[in-house]
Amino acid sequence: MVSIFLNIYTVRNINFIRKHTMSLNIKHIENEIIDQYLYDENPTRPWIIGFSGGKDSTMLLQMVWNALKKIDTAVFQRPVYVVCNDTLVENPKIVLFIEETLKQIQEAANKQSLNIQVVKTTPRLEDTFWVNLIGKGYPAPNKFYRWCTDRLKINPTTRFILEQIGEKGEAIILLGTRSDESRSRAASIKRHEVKGQRLRKHVLPNAYVYAPIKDILTEDLWQYLLQNPPPWGGTHRDLITLYRNATGGDCPLVIDTTTPSCGQSRFGCWVCTVVKKDKSMDALIDNGEEWMEPLQELRDFLVETRDTPEVYREKRRRDGSEKEGMWGPYKLEVRAEILKRLLKAQKEIQQTEGIELITHQEMVLIQYHWFRDCFFKTKVSQIYNRIFTNKIDMSKQEEKYKQEAELLKKSCKQEPKDVELIQDLLALQKTKTLMIRKRGLQADIDNRLNQYIEELNLPVYMN
């Protein structure tokens, strides 16, 4: 009986000490944030808060918000940006949650007269996942070849940071990274921090990193969120439910190669093939989000295409070289198959969720790259129109093209094979209107001519 009493007494004491210690830590961090904001050697450099909608960045933003409320913002008008990067292939369930949260943040900041502005960054059209994978034939990423991280995550945010540095001279990036999150995260923080200083230099010139909650434990973080509703309104109930259903952490704002990308059970891109299994998607499906099953099936197919290059990829690389064990881009018919599966998945989930997986602009650029790779037999619009009832026409001059085709047939009566060649060359020429840079067009035309000569079994003459 005495031992039971002592155990209960000990547990209560531990909980009291933990709660008291956490409250002291929170107060200390808030005071530190206020001090950094007010007494910075450069009071004009903006704060850029990396926000992913997950638990770490949510706590960071909430603490900064509460600190700013204690400052006379009429006197101190340092701009604060809440930057959220959308790769355009994020887990759709997370996208819906984040979009609503960002809307609440901006509305509340305006009402509370806080100099906070929400900014959403996205990759350039030519850098999107589908343009590179389906258009150019880039293989699904793995841990050794993560071509997606720079294009989808680092570059969009970097462009915004550089814009602010160009305008203000310097910028401070606030991140929700924590040592307790993982061993690799702890090692990264320790490796880059400067002892005795709050800020560390970022890889970008005139940019600095500030991680106010780096020493907060995960248990304390959840306790804080459970006890303190977000100052922008509502509760953290939806956030907690997401974690409960997906059993994972959140993706950090990736600003350089030292920041770990998402994997294991973390929320991230639904197309991510860096890991074998997407545990967060599996868990969401198991917890009632069955509409995500088509996405899971497509992701698993991408893993298959990556793991069996001898089936799905060209032997020859883009530079024309061939080497044992070194594979080229996806075969053209494989790219068409991936697009077909993607559009079928989009049609299926749009019936219940209304989510768009690929944009019209991306499909136009994919067609451009297919033309450049001399893939003319199958067109993007043909694949789309077989799946959807609302047809798309990528050629506003379709009637003109038909007239051109008839004229070509008449002109090439004696050499009917030349009709296809000339049509392909015209298609290549027309695609240049899609891109600002026309570099490589002459090489594309030369490649098509050489391909035609090879089909006729004639000797190929290289310049």
Where are these regions (language model features)?
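Nucleotide-activated chemistry modules centered on ATP-dependent adenylation/adenylyltransferase
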Residues: 2-48, 55-463
